[in-house]
Amino acid sequence: MDPFVGWFQKEQEGPSLCTWLKIWETNAQEMGALLNQQLQQATTINGSTSSSSSSSNSGNNNNNNNNNIINNTITNTTNNTGNNSSAKPYLSRPYSSLNRVLNFRADSLEILQQQQQQQQLNGTTQRNSTNINTTSGGSTSSSADSTTNRDNNSPANSSSTNGPGAGTGTSTGAGGTGTNSPATTASSTAATTTGPATSMSDTSNNPPQSTTTPASRTNSIYYNPSRKKRPENKAGGAHYYMNNHMEMIAKYKGEPWRKPDYPYGEGVIGLHEEIEHFYQYVLPTPCEHAIRNEVVKRIEAVVHSIWPQAVVEIFGSFRTGLFLPTSDIDLVVLGLWEKLPLRTLEFELVSRGIAEACTVRVLDKASVPIIKLTDRETQVKVDISFNMQSGVQSAELIKKFKRDYPVLEKLVLVLKQFLLLRDLNEVFTGGISSYSLILMCISFLQMHPRGIYHDTANLGVLLLEFFELYGRRFNYMKIGISIKNGGRYMPKDELQRDMVDGHRPSLLCIEDPLTPGNDIGRSSYGVFQVQQAFKCAYRVLALAVSPLNLLGIDPRVNSILGRIIHITDDVIDYREWIRENFEHLVVVDRISPLPTAAPTAYATANGAPKYVIMPSGAVVQQLYHHPVQVPTAHGHSHAHSHSHGHAHPGAHLCQPYVTGTTVSAVTTTTTMAVVTVGVSAGGVQQQQQQQNATAHTHSQQQTQNQSQSRHRRGSTSSGDDSEDSKDGDVVETTSSAQEVVDIALSTPNGLANMSMPMPVHAVGMPASNSWSGNGNGNGNSSSSTGSSPEIAHIAAQEMDPELEDQQQQQQHQETSGGNGFIRPGDVGTGSNRGGGDGSGGRNYNQRNNHNSSGYYHQQYYVPPPMQQQLSKSNSSSNYHQQHHHSHSHGNHSHRQQHHHQQQHHHQQRPQHLRVGGGNRYQKSLGGSPIISAGNASNSSSNCSNSSSSSGSNNSRLPPLRGTLVNSSSAISIISISSESSIASSSSSSSRSGQDQQRDER
């Protein structure tokens, strides 16, 4: 095995290890032909110093004293490589690294050097001195260079005269790298300065003594266990034994994920079980999540104190949930600046005590200027960038693929730890970034011949196949990677035509799925080292899981996964340190038990759980502060909030959870007011039977069924707003003065059988939009309760009060399940509870359609003056809506004419403002989905046969459609949702709309 990318296993230790080291060191250092030449040169230099008393030296002071001369003055000049007598000047490795190897096990190079030194000692006269005392620059704070003094058996004093730039030298035996030759310990006395030169007086004792002090033992420096980036915390990039990796795992043995009494299986079964346990171990604890949230809050407070209108967003691994315990936090500040205020923010962060000045670095010359800092209290590392919205878009894209491939996150976390140990996880050091690694994993799963869409796949087999593909099979020279449109491998010649600025494809060419022409792996110049590491890992794991079991590995005793990855003692100590010092941030206060399969809650606030522990161990945090209940705007909204879908303005304002077939939540965010679709099935047919009790309600239902095709495809607002909402219209909701933080981590098995808290309704938005099917896709009878305000209002006035109360009670039971939580069976993308062919889960047959429909598009920040203009526009539209509530009875022809005008207006709208495709859904920044509404052609055909109750006019359309609406500056919201919301598929609704249209014809 190549020791530069891995380490030796237990079965490799023995007599053959020294031979292997000798072969490797001879070949790697190219010492075969040069070793004799170097030794001869060293012998020649030593012979010349015996006859003449002059030697050359640069950073090291070599004082060679000859007893034939009583007072010997030595002039020191330049020598860039160190001690000449030990044959070290021509070695490429530092001597301290070789000494660490010697402390563990002597290699061939050290043995040869010792033999040569012994021969030199035997060939010299007794009156020549060959003692070496080396003081390392790291052991003394007064000198950066090492001082070497050679004195032996001489009663006379020798003085060395340094150049004008020399300083006072100190010689200590503690930092020396002594040899086995007879030596005397030289004690340095006071140094006297004469003119421009520095005179150093050394006295020596006559009795010969041998002193050997390992430098690696004396230079032990204590580091805070939270510091991630340390040169010695790597297992690759240098020899395994050169960086004391065995000492780094001596305390906990490097395998804390293994369960002592667990019966691990043989081969790939045991490897799969270990990967599962590793994933469970590295998941963040509630305390670790809390400290990260506190760090984000402190930095966000500083940013808002400087720029009240700025927006702070989280992206990267903390947003996607694919972060290790020592990973950093990636933040982006969105605002309007002519010049990025890097130095301003740096000064404020240091002056307010967020970070120490020595830990803050401003990389203003980088392609993406960032501020790197380490939080003073928690030692969490943070990277802050400005106006880089591509990171948020990439995070949302990764979260989408996490839902499509449940095994993705487990595979990625193992690979990230694998590259971290080998120092191959940073682009500026030649490695590959986390984003590149995730895209490689996505491409691997997309191109897998078996089609990995379920979470029951063997992770051990997948890990082996990943190492085999990118370590042995993949052609890095000619092939590029693309994950768009279902994924493919493409020739680099084809990619070069699309590259921006005429750049050639890099060695690791990965097409950016969000920015055409951008190469993600362009800066990874050390791809061959990564390939070599993958290749080595494949060989190690293949031998370990082989059915022949040639290595004699017992999986119940020896770890298979531990042969390629370890968790160092520093990481384990850091997690324990976090738990001991910051456990007060998570107040354990158990409340009443939740329904079956529901999360366990901690630290409730106003009845809503603050922290939720998922069954897999993942942490979901809902609130930092208590939600503020906004008073009811008018009685009509409160009276009909259940029967007509008019949301209470302050009802559950802060709860972030949403499922695919239930009413979704609307949270006020700093960057966007998210409008989601709610689908409540089960009581639609009974409601239609109740409405058929009277002739008037029967006629109203016919009108309602005619207009259903317009609301069926993802409309989220009232009847006069359906066309606007499906085009990504932004609605500004009521803002509160409290800070809301919504954090949810993904679960390993998706959200198929997980209960969620009660959904939230937006201010002025419908609470439900239900449909039901008859099982064969034909003759679907739909009810758009809450979609058309005036129709629902008229029906409510004509309805008997008892029927209305019964309807309200039924809808409340269907929505809340009686316990305030959605039933597990309600969760699923594209499922129809009223019938039809919905499966309640993901429809993986439509994967290519989802991939071909495009990706998440991030919108932009809008200044407050434009927000006020948009608010006025929304206010005028609400006025027109209320006006039509009271005056549109019997004006069917007028509504029909107005609907055609509005339809014609939307057909002429620019296509770039339309969001989504027929089978596409989007995720908002806060984790709540935005249901994209079908194609424009289907929209026009469906809406042409329906009567509209629209109460808006051209003033209803804001001038900045498709842009983000920032809330007031007092609102501060951070959304880090990963799996807490799943958008319902619009494909089923589109098919239902087409079937309804055929029935009407």
Curated annotation (Swiss-Prot):
It holds the Pfam family PAP_assoc. It is found in: Cytoplasm. Disruption phenotype: RNAi-mediated knockdown causes lethality at the third-instar larval or early pupal stage. Residues 164-178, 827-841 have a biased composition (Gly residues). Residues 44-92, 115-238, 631-652, 687-740, 767-963, 977-1001 are annotated as: Disordered. Residues 635-649, 881-912 have a biased composition (Basic residues). Its EC number is 2.7.7.19. One of its GO terms (cellular component) is TRAMP complex. Coiled coil: none annotated. It catalyses: RNA(n) + ATP = RNA(n)-3'-adenine ribonucleotide + diphosphate. InterPro entries: MTPAP-like_central (IPR054708), NT_sf (IPR043519), PAP_assoc (IPR002058), Trf4-like (IPR045862). Residues 458-517 form the PAP-associated domain. Involved in a post-transcriptional quality control mechanism limiting inappropriate expression of genetic information. Polyadenylation is required for the degradative activity of the exosome on several of its nuclear RNA substrates. Polyadenylates RNA processing and degradation intermediates of snRNAs and mRNAs. This is Non-canonical poly(A) RNA polymerase protein Trf4-1. It comes from Drosophila melanogaster (Fruit fly). The lineage of its organism: Eukaryota, Metazoa, Ecdysozoa, Arthropoda, Hexapoda.
